[in-house]
């Protein structure tokens, strides 16, 4: 049996803390665009929901948990995670930082620097192996985003991975704006595509090693398990013990509870 002493990330004041450390060292990435590092093949996205993942098998599953949201306007404000996560000891973990641009978004040296600092703070959480940035940047915001990622890369400790989520349309461009980004990998989000399902193929090398799917879109989610990519799985509500059991066994569960 896998050890079940829980790791508990929760909010304490303005930051996150953990109750028991994760063990094991990061393997330094070589910047290859495939499945690098020691992460398991299937990673659970854990958004702003109370999560109990203690029945997950850390040999099979990892977690990318929302650590904080960053709102960029004339200045930068930060909202830390407010919901508790319980995980089994030794589970591979990655901090996710969600960036959102307000109507009065300002791109300047100060907002770029502060945003990068927030991402770096999340990367310093004990037990996390790296950081994933989630920002649906408009074309006019891409220079801002690229510079934030460059500053984060420059400040990351050796061995910590830097990843990003990516719209599928970004990944469809072979020589697009992503080609010079200093990230280890980008995760194309193959869900919530509506009528655009099947429109885009992946041509950007950064996007070739991973895929993001949702359990309430089972056709695409199940197909992802037949490939060789790392699979990030999103659930619209908190993960259940039943769903985790299915994932432990190598299958994608259905979202039987329906939408909110």
Question: Can you say where each PLM-predicted feature lies in the sequence?
Answer:
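Secreted glycan hydrolases and related glycan-binding modules that recognize and/or cleave
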Residues: 4-9, 20-260
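Sec-dependent bacterial lipoprotein signal peptides
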Residues: 9-15
